Amino acid sequence: VKENKSWIFKKKQIEENIKKKKFILVDSRIQDRFEGRVEEPRPGLKRGHIKNAVNIPFKDCVDLEKNMLKDKSELEKLFNQKNIRNTDDVVFYCGSGTSCAVNAFTWYKITGKSPQIYMGSWSEFGKK
C-alpha cells in the first residue's frame, strides 16, 4: 500500500482555500457541531466550523435501516442541495479525520473521482 499525497490535504492548503476558494470544503460532522450549538467532545477545541465550509453530516449519506450508503440518486440530490456538482473539487473533513471517510467514499460513488480529505480536521483546525 502506498500513500497518495494528492488525496490528503494539510492545514496550510485549507487556510489558502479560505482566501482563494479553489475547492469546496465539506464538514461531515453533525449540524449542531458545525453550527457551534454544542460543545466539542475533545477538550481544547472551539465551537463552529472552518470558514466557507458546507455541512453534510456523514449520517445523511447512510441508510440506517440497511446500514449502507443510500442510493446514488439520493446522494446526488443531497450534494446538489448544497450546490455541489459532480465537476467540483471537494475536500472532506470531520472532527478527527475518520468519519469524513464516509462522505469521501460517497463522493467516489457519485463521481468516480478519488476523494480528498483534510486529515487534521477540526481537531487540528479548531484548536483554541
Regions found by a protein language model. Name each.
Residues 1-128:
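Cytosolic catalytic domains that perform sulfur/thiol-centered chemistry
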